[in-house]
């Protein structure tokens, strides 16, 4: 049976950027990695009602910079920026270095795989029929300009005794084309019958040229030595 590779993992460095960008030596690498995990876990729990898409973490010169991508920036910022200041203080305490929080608004949540998956899972938890939730998500994405979308749900659908998976696709969703901009994410719906898994693939078009290259500083070239006998 043919299995599907993770669409984000196969495109890392080609059309997908890393969610954590920093360099560390052998001593600090594990601590930084665990710190990233803790920060993401903390923010996901705190901002579960803020339509969180993704969290990117950078570590420039003994500090940490966290960018929160959300469809509802007002919920994250809070009244007069009180909530975001509390988050900044908590993250600085967790990381042990000064923290900076940037907020990036997701303009079209219907074209963000994570937000679409979370929306479907919340509908399933509210006992909306799974086919209706899937079809609505697909129609909204196609209406807003997606080239293709595939939605898959798996589990005890409709309270059935035997678990199964169903999927719905519209348009093109090329899984092997590396230059294809595929946004992929998953979510879980916790229902009275058990957990229902939700997977969403959204094809937004092809990226020509890939990611911008990181230009390294060129070392001064050494003068060429003349070979003997010339």
UniProtKB/Swiss-Prot annotation:
Keywords: Ribonucleoprotein, Ribosomal protein, RNA-binding, rRNA-binding. GO terms for molecular function: mRNA binding; rRNA binding; structural constituent of ribosome. Pfam families: KH_2, Ribosomal_S3_C. One of its GO terms (biological process) is translation. InterPro entries: KH_dom, KH_dom-like_a/b, KH_dom_type_2, KH_sf_prok-type, Ribosomal_S3_C_sf, Ribosomal_uS3_bac-typ, Ribosomal_uS3_C, Ribosomal_uS3_CS. Coiled coil: none annotated. SMART domains: KH. GO terms for cellular component: cytosolic small ribosomal subunit. Binds the lower part of the 30S subunit head. Binds mRNA in the 70S ribosome, positioning it for translation. Part of the 30S ribosomal subunit. Forms a tight complex with proteins S10 and S14. Belongs to the universal ribosomal protein uS3 family. This is Small ribosomal subunit protein uS3. It comes from Psychromonas ingrahamii (strain DSM 17664 / CCUG 51855 / 37). The gene is rpsC.
């Amino acid at each position: 049976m043919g299995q599907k590779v993770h669409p984000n993992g196969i495109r890392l460095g080609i059309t997908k950027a890393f969610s954590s960008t920093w360099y560390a030596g052998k001593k600090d690498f594990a601590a930084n990695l665990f710190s990233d995990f803790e920060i993401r876990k903390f923010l996901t729990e705190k901002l579960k009602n803020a339509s969180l898409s993704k969290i990117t973490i950078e570590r420039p010169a003994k500090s940490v910079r966290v960018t929160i991508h959300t469809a509802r920036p007002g919920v994250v910022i809070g009244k007069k920026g009180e909530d975001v200041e509390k988050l900044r203080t908590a993250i600085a305490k967790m990381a042990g270095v000064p923290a900076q929080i940037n907020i990036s608004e997701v303009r079209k949540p219907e074209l963000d795989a994570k937000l679409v998956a979370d929306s479907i899972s919340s509908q399933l938890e509210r006992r909306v029929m799974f086919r209706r939730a899937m079809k609505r998500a697909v129609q909204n994405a196609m209406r807003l300009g997606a080239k293709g979308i595939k939605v898959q749900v798996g589990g005890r659908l409709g309270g059935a005794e035997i678990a199964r998976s169903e999927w719905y696709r519209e348009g093109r969703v090329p899984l092997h084309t590396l230059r294809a901009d595929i946004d992929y994410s998953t979510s879980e719906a916790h229902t009275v019958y058990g957990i229902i898994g939700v997977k969403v693939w959204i094809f937004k078009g092809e990226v020509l040229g890939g990611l911008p290259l990181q230009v390294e500083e060129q070392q001064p070239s050494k003068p060429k030595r003349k070979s003997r006998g010339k």
